[in-house]
Amino acid sequence: MTVTAAMVKELREKTGAGMMDCKKALAETNGDMEAAIDWLRAKGIAKADKKSGRTAAEGLIGIASSGTKAVVVEINSETDFVARNDAFQELVRGVANVALGTDGSVAAVSKATYPATGKSVEDTIKDAIATIGENMTLRRSALLEVEDGVVATYVHNAAGEGIGKLGVLVALKSTGDKEALNAIGRQVAMHVAATNPLAVRSSEIDPAVAERERNVFIEQSRASGKPDNIIEKMVDGRMRKFFEEVALLSQAFVMNPDQTVEAAIKEAEKSVGAPIEVAGIARLLLGEGVEKEESDFAAEVAAAAKG
């Protein structure tokens, strides 16, 4: 397969690797972008695929909650100017509230009736496009619900009540005190916003993702020239660390790095007065997974921290 300049540029943007390294990686992997990323990582040239950290679209994340049930939605716009528009912000809040009465899927939310217009959410968004003069789309939504307990919420970079650039839901099952439960739930939600875990528990991580990491670690370890039995132990150790870093419960708690999230939740059971189980998490970052070259979420966060 012919390696084009556009392919090299895309790989450079995703990995930060040099142009010649990117060209070689693509040649070695027959133009397979994901395989080329792994090839660069195995050679120690790139740490990881950066694409998940790049902001790709404007708009807002909206959250609505009823205590034991909460939903997070993403509505994209073309410009940040529209995202600051009062009418657009009200639309995002309204769609989130409508979504709370559905199963949380984009299809169900789109077909649901928007009370203020009497039309479907889909048609209401179309009307807003005509009024505001910019394309908009309901891109993603997620819903969590528990029978006993709470679904805690957190909005980062809030533009107003329940709307912002990043939204998190954390479902906690417990028969204990709701106020205390919501307090630890909000802390865990803030932690999820900061660390973006792949799953609640290591056993829930996609086997394909784990296998991909193992293969990269194997290639990296082989470069040491050590015997296979030593390499196997090295890889096993790195996989244990990988699971600890990407599974929520085993991560160091952002609020207190001296304990894990699991330990923090266990400690909170004293004030809650009952056992707590993390039943699920949902995290939506605006524009995640759809790249936009001129905007880098990591750079925005760094700039905000300095300002």
Curated annotation (Swiss-Prot):
Transmembrane segments: none annotated. SUPFAM superfamilies: Elongation factor Ts (EF-Ts), dimerisation domain, UBA-like. Residues 79-82 are annotated as: Involved in Mg(2+) ion dislocation from EF-Tu. GO terms for cellular component: cytoplasm. GO terms for molecular function: translation elongation factor activity. Its main location: cytoplasm. Pfam families: EF_TS (PF00889). Keywords: Cytoplasm, Elongation factor, Protein biosynthesis. It is found in: Cytoplasm. The keyword Zinc does not apply. The keyword Iron does not apply. Belongs to the EF-Ts family. HAMAP family: EF_Ts. Associates with the EF-Tu.GDP complex and induces the exchange of GDP to GTP. It remains bound to the aminoacyl-tRNA.EF-Tu.GTP complex up to the GTP hydrolysis stage on the ribosome. This is Elongation factor Ts. It comes from Rhizobium meliloti (strain 1021) (Ensifer meliloti). The lineage of its organism: Bacteria, Pseudomonadati, Pseudomonadota, Alphaproteobacteria, Hyphomicrobiales. The gene is tsf.
